[in-house]
Design a protein with these regions (language model features):
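Bacterial lipoprotein signal-peptidase II cleavage site
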Residues: 21-33
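Hydrophobic alpha-helical segments within soluble ligand-binding/sensing domains
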Residues: 56-58, 149-190, 290-310
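Extracytoplasmic "Venus flytrap"
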Residues: 58-82, 88, 95-105, 198-202, ...
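An alpha-beta-alpha
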Residues: 63, 81, 167-213, 311, ...
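Structural motif
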Residues: 93-115, 224-238
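Beta-alpha junction/loop-to-helix N-cap segments that form part of ligand/metal-binding clefts
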Residues: 98-156, 250-274
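Pocket-lining segment of extracytoplasmic ligand-binding domains
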Residues: 200-269, 275
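Flexible loop/turn connectors
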Residues: 278-329
């Protein structure tokens, strides 16, 4: 058999090593002992790490979920969160709780989730997040559908929470939504801003909308509600006073959007809304974020915390990239209002 240069090199290297072993000095016993100890320490460390990984892989985590109210955006956030953990192969038991829009119920549920010894709690919407954060400073809390966690006193800063809270923000492209309004309704003169005065996120977005409307030279009026029972009356009071309604990602309005749409559409008042679920419920249009992806992002944060040892105190609040915002128009509503949307496609 013909021997290649590479094979010859290997053989010569083996012979040389053997000759050096036979003719060289005897190994230093102390050095040998040190090498053995180092090898044993390394082996022990690797075994400990492997055991830890095996334990984490085999563990079933308890996760409590507190959702403020049932409506499409928050439901999708919840679904995305659960999907991310399942996709990562993390074994979880979810304790799903819904406060049905009752902030006092949020407090009761928050206490229960903490006392049940959950490994992590996922809070959807600001009141739910504030309730849980007020009960524990040790259990990791991930939040979502919260516009500005820092402004809501949930974290020290959105860049560095410095506490047991992090998560994802649903800050919407308010300016772009006002731009969309102008594109669809170029003759709009006065806008009615509809939101719940008790929701900090809604107040923040309303202020952002006012800035955008001021820049555009469009007048506006505030129309606020403090309970769902007021929605129909407040929307009816807009008739004859506004050309268009703008409502941000407001949980109370989202849950009652069918009522808003019923009154607004009957009176030929277009509604530009904060998210897709509100369009499905009868709103005219939005340029908004994908709440499923928002929840999925929070789920990925949970995976990092539970299985990778990520420190929630240094985990910045996550934001969806603007490129993931999507235009959605309710064609049936546009037809009912007699609005041409062909230019949007």
């Amino acid at each position: 058999m013909k021997m290649t240069k590479k094979m010859m090199g290997l053989v010569l290297a083996g012979v040389l090593a053997a000759s050096m072993t036979g003719c060289g000095k005897k190994a230093d016993p102390a050095a040998t002992a040190t090498a053995v100890e180092t090898t044993e320490e390394t082996k022990a460390a690797e075994e400990t790490k492997a055991a830890g990984e095996t334990e984490a892989a085999g563990k079933t985590y308890k996760i409590g979920v507190l959702q403020l109210v049932q409506h499409t955006a928050l439901d999708k956030t919840n679904e995305g969160f659960v999907a991310a953990l399942k996709d990562a192969g993390v074994s979880c038991e979810f304790d799903q709780q819904n406060a049905a829009g009752d902030q006092s119920a949020c407090q009761t549920i928050a206490n229960t989730l903490v006392n049940n010894g959950n490994d992590l709690i996922f809070a959807i919407a600001t009141p739910a997040a504030q309730a849980v954060a007020g009960v524990t400073d040790s259990i990791p809390i991930l939040v979502s559908a919260v516009t500005d966690p820092a402004a809501s006193d949930l974290v020290d800063s959105n860049e560095a929470p410095n506490c047991n809270v992090s998560g994802t923000s649903d800050l919407t492209p308010v300016k772009e939504q006002i731009d969309l309004m102008q594109k669809i309704l170029p003759d709009v003169k006065t806008v009615g801003l509809l939101y719940c005065s008790a929701e900090a996120n809604s107040v923040l977005q309303a202020e952002m909308a006012k800035e955008a409307l001021d820049t555009a030279g469009i007048a506006y009026k505030d129309y606020t509600v403090s309970s769902s029972n007021e929605i129909q009356t407040v929307v009816e009071s807009m008739v004859g006073n506004v050309d268009c309604i703008y409502t941000p990602t407001d949980n109370m309005i989202a849950a009652g959007m069918t009522t808003v749409a019923m009154v607004a559409n009957e009176n030929k008042i277009p509604t530009i809304v904060g998210e897709e679920g509100m369009v499905d419920a009868g709103g005219l249009a939005t340029y908004g974020i994908d709440y499923y992806q928002l929840g999925y992002m929070a789920g990925e944060q949970a995976v990092a915390i539970l299985t990778e040892g990520a420190d929630i105190k240094t985990m910045p609040i996550g934001y969806l990239d603007a490129s993931k915002c999507t235009l959605k128009v309710n064609e049936e509503t546009a037809k009912e209002l007699g609005i041409d949307i062909s230019g949007l496609k």
